[in-house]
């Protein structure tokens, strides 16, 4: 049995390498599709809570999960190597039907069979036929490899059209941004969270992209990026926050966003009486919805610029929707279609137990002193600084405690750059020698930030940001 292991392993690796090459040309890759299936199946708040407790709030958990999925794929294809090729190849093709369309499944089955035939030596029981059989086996392997190469090229060719739709990103648009006021988050520092591995995020070519607007509309239309940019534009300063951001976490940022008002699109397509919901469709299969009645009271923006420059691929190029007062999960990137529907369609994460409404919770954060370096000099005046944010709720007061909440001092607020932006706050403090527990809370009129600590999943984190600072 173990004599077959090298051949089984080599066949599995060669199949995976050819599949990877085909994927770069646009052909679906089974390990990636398998990873997507597992991600969707395990994408519940409870599972994310476990993942975040182990790997934090970044992409590390997704990266490790993909490595695990790839190893699973290799293990399964290696196991096929211990079966006769006439059994293994059909089993592979049939199994892949659960992950990919039948032409791709068939292609993988055929390529795998040819790999096995090309690598398996021919046997003969006649010593007199040794020379002839050796010649035939070499010729057979050579012909099989030629055929394999032809099939591989055909497989790659089949994906060229699809690959051209998701090829290199075209960012030949406006000039570089000017200097932004204090408090804005540079694009390079803006938080990034995706349901995908970053390498699998859509890479859209502007020349091949259109935004389709259809459903319960009177005049279905499609818009190129150039056509959207020709429409009257708006610029909005808006803080975006991720629903998985923990109390005091880094998954929020303030950007200056430019794009087309959603109301402008509404005027151009007109709605039927049946239109009750907006359903957003993204290039990576992500969907979300919003009641049309709520959209009327919000300044929705179809954004194509961030901080004065075109959106980067990570942040949604060529187009994303921005919805004030909601967490990022309600605001898809890489938009390809806006559908007006008579009934709601639960979004990608909603179907997995996440928040239906995703309203931003009232929150505040201490940015200085640093939580990960909480050491200050005793008897030396400093400014405790941070941000507060409430989505659609204006921040009217921020209080800071230096003794763990026994006493509270009111911080000084800076006027926010817009009604959708976070509020910067500061408090002068001269620490005495020793340990001090800093704590912060924010207010919107009579509404106070929730003190009860709750996990970020599924409705958004609550609680006061607090940590110990040592003064010496």
Language-model features, listed with the residues they occupy:
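Hydrophobic alpha-helical transmembrane segments
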Residues: 56-81
